[in-house]
């Protein structure tokens, strides 16, 4: 049965004001230095006409060789990349990832990876990051190295190279606006820590680092703990099969409480990671965490992001009372994204996450990634735009920072979110998601409205349409005009369509 919605253009109840950089993103550390990351899916796998497999491997260790490939460093001076990134307006850029935890800062240009590290970052590469952030008028969030090359687990964190990272940054005229200590510390065995590292070691070292930051760079926000706990995966599958398998991949795990209870230096922002599940690449080891593609528009699938937020809110209140929550990695699936991550169907999850998060709390969502792997806004290497790029670009252009109560319960066919207008004019901006694959949603407009309707030829289309016109770059890599149509009366949202409505 189709849903009926009546919008209001009169004053609505204000829920909160949210960060104007709510929509932000990651540039993976391995992109900056060059290195291994997830091997791209084939066009047939993306279209859903070819099943993904891990090359006959029967365990994750054997599979990894088929799942990864080596990529050269990203060119952060690329004119097309900068132009497309700048379209978003001011954002946060997070340069981090597990790769960062094991990277040596090769400020002297030796080209040698010291024992205990796995990768090197050159001074030129770091300056490239700073130039990119400045060119697009962004703010920078980082994490630092903490591995056997830095110190043994029962020794204090060696700050020598870390201090140099800050010195080089500030001598260049840039700033480190925020920092996490390390990426995903819950996974003690695989995140890159010194051998034998414990939750107690983590608490000691986070205090040492954040204490030093607060003393020497008081304007830098201390963010953490980069928690990986929370709701994830298909609950129906989890009810039918054991939840085990995570340990086979992640090894020894620590809870957020175990990491944080021993700390003494307060944080400024609470952070966690959200993925809706795990991709086909890791389904072999964690099948209960992988979603089948025919569930991507279901209420169960779309409920994961707000459930993960609600799980972390009490932890935020405990460890950073009154602080913002930052989702410092967000995507459809851990493991580089699902085969459908780069297609139209993931737009529903992305916009629903932005809407539900802003309804629940204040903070920033760092989409993983800007231009790496299948969940990137842009295709790796060519920087071709994907549906999610245009979806969040419209969000940033249309949806303001004041969040209103729509008085509409979230339900199939009617995920409705209301904000102030981004242009600052009086009125209301709505995002309305019809996630039903079979039924039409009707929307009654109380006044003349500007409508931006999103659709595609198929759910797994790699090109999205705005008011019937394909959203693709022109021959000069310019973003197409994204103009609304003016409507009055009744707006019809066909199955699996989305509309921004501005009044």
Can you describe what each PLM-predicted range is?
Residues 121, 127, 275-334:
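Glycoside hydrolase catalytic-domain groove-lining segments
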Residues 260, 264-276, 280-283:
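Anion-binding catalytic surfaces of enzymes that hydrolyze or transfer phosphate/sulfate esters
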Residues 184, 214, 273-275, 290:
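Histidine-centered active-site/metal-ligand motif
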């Amino acid at each position: 049965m189709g849903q009926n919605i009546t919008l209001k253009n009169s004053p609505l109840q204000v829920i909160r004001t949210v960060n104007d950089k709510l929509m932000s993103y990651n540039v993976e550390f391995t992109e900056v230095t060059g290195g291994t990351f997830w091997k791209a899916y084939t066009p047939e796998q993306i279209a859903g006409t070819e099943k993904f497999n891990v090359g006959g491997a029967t365990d994750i260790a054997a599979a990894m060789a088929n799942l990864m490939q080596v990529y050269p460093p990203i060119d952060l001076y690329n004119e097309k990349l900068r132009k497309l990134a700048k379209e978003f307006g001011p954002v946060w850029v997070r340069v981090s990832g597990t790769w960062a935890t094991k990277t040596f800062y090769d400020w002297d240009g030796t080209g040698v990876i010291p024992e205990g590290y796995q990768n090197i970052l050159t001074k030129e590469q770091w300056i490239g990051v700073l130039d990119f952030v400045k060119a697009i008028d962004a703010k920078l969030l980082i994490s630092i190295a903490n591995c056997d090359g830095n110190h043994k687990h029962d020794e204090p964190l060696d700050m020598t190279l870390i201090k140099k990272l800050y010195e080089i940054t500030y001598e260049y005229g840039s700033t480190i606006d925020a920092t996490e200590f390390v990426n995903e510390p819950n996974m003690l065995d695989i995140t890159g820590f010194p051998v034998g590292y414990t939750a107690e070691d983590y608490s000691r070292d986070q205090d040492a680092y954040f204490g030093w930051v607060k003393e020497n760079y008081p304007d830098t926000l201390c963010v953490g703990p980069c928690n990986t706990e929370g709701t994830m995966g298909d609950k129906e599958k989890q009810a039918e099969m054991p939840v085990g398998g995570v340990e086979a991949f992640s090894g020894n795990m620590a809870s957020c409480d175990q990491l944080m209870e021993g700390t003494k230096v307060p944080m400024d922002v609470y952070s966690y990671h959200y993925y809706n599940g795990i991709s086909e690449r890791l389904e072999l080891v964690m099948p209960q965490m992988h979603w089948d593609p025919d569930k991507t528009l279901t209420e169960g699938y779309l409920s994961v992001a707000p459930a993960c937020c609600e799980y972390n809110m009490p932890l935020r209140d405990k460890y950073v009372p009154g602080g913002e929550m930052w989702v410092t990695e967000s995507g459809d699936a851990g493991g580089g994204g699902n085969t459908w991550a780069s297609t139209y169907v993931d737009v529903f999850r992305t916009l629903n996450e932005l809407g539900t998060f802003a309804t629940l709390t204040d903070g920033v969502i760092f989409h993983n990634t800007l231009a790496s792997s299948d969940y990137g806004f842009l295709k790796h290497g060519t920087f071709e735009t994907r549906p999610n790029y245009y979806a969040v670009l419209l969000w940033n252009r249309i949806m303001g920072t004041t969040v209103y109560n729509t008085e509409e319960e979230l339900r199939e066919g009617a995920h409705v979110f209301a904000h102030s207008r981004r242009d600052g004019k009086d009125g209301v901006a709505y995002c309305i998601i019809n996630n039903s694959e079979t039924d039409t949603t009707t929307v009654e407009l109380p006044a003349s409205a500007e409508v931006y309707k999103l659709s595609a030829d198929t759910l797994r289309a790699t090109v999205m349409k705005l008011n019937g016109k394909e959203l693709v770059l022109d021959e000069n890599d310019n973003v197409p005009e994204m103009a609304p149509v003016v409507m009055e009366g009744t707006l019809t949202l066909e199955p699996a369509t989305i509309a921004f409505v501005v009044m």
